[in-house]
């Protein structure tokens, strides 16, 4: 499995890669990918760590599971490949950006443009079997991605963590809120958003205001 990962992230995560749980996880994932259709493609499993260096990371958005439909997942949470129809949660993300920042809804749901600016688009589980949501949960991915959050929290300062929905909010305990900004809201899925838990959170403008206050470039959402 030829994975892409920026060297700076590799340096930070090397200890984790050598742990027994991670070796067992990778053995399981290799078997899954050889025996079943899984997403994202093998070389994109670690894509979240390949667009910006660890040093340049200034925003973390936490998702739960990759999309499990054909051709959707590209290794970045909430993102889809160019030309793929927007999933409902992504539509609601773009609607919130539209109302918050007065930006038109883009023509593509590919969020590589965010990742290139230092937004870590991290799913808690980095792979999934086709058409079986949650099929790779509780196999070790969550241990790994929790450690990613801890490393960012402990070794960086002034990062914005966007935690949407109950699952993501549980990760608050991994983050030092004395040196980072944590913004929480309901999930952008229609079930949550249509009940008033998503729209109007203004997370995108709040993120940029905080980054500018720390002397950082704002994100071009």
From Swiss-Prot:
Coiled coil: none annotated. Its EC number is 3.2.2.27. Gene3D superfamilies: Uracil-DNA glycosylase-like domain. Keywords: Cytoplasm, DNA damage, DNA repair, Hydrolase. Its main location: cytoplasm. GO terms for biological process: base-excision repair, AP site formation via deaminated base removal. It catalyses: Hydrolyzes single-stranded DNA or mismatched double-stranded DNA and polynucleotides, releasing free uracil. InterPro entries: UDG_fam1, Ura-DNA_Glyclase_AS, Uracil-DNA_glycosylase-like, Uracil-DNA_glycosylase-like_sf. It is found in: Cytoplasm. The active site is at 65 (proton acceptor). GO terms for cellular component: cytoplasm. Pfam families: UDG (PF03167). The keyword Methyltransferase does not apply. It is an enzyme of class 3 (hydrolase). GO terms for molecular function: uracil DNA N-glycosylase activity. The keyword Transcription does not apply. Belongs to the uracil-DNA glycosylase (UDG) superfamily. UNG family. Excises uracil residues from the DNA which can arise as a result of misincorporation of dUMP residues by DNA polymerase or due to deamination of cytosine. HAMAP family: UDG. This is Uracil-DNA glycosylase. It comes from Christiangramia forsetii (strain DSM 17595 / CGMCC 1.15422 / KT0803).
């Amino acid at each position: 499995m030829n994975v892409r990962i920026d060297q700076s992230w590799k340096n930070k995560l090397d200890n984790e890669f050598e742990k027994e749980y991670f070796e067992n996880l990778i053995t399981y994932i290799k078997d899954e990918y050889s025996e079943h259709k899984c997403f994202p493609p093998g070389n994109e499993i670690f894509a979240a760590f390949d667009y910006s260096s660890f040093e340049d990371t200034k925003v973390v958005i936490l998702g739960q599971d990759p999309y499990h439909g054909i051709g959707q997942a590209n290794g970045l949470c909430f993102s889809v490949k160019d030309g793929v129809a927007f999933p409902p949660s992504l539509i609601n993300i773009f609607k919130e950006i539209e109302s918050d920042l007065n930006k038109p809804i883009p023509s593509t749901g590919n969020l590589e443009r965010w990742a290139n600016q230092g937004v870590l688009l991290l799913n808690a589980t980095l792979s999934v079997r086709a058409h079986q949501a949650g099929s790779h949960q509780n196999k070790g991915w969550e241990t790994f991605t929790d450690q990613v959050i801890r490393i960012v929290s402990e070794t960086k300062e002034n990062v914005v963590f966007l935690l949407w929905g109950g699952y993501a909010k549980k990760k608050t305990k991994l983050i030092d809120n004395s040196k980072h900004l944590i913004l929480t809201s309901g999930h952008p899925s229609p079930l949550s958003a249509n009940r008033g838990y998503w729209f109007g959170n203004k997370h995108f403008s709040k993120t940029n205001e905080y980054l500018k206050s720390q002397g950082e470039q704002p994100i071009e959402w």
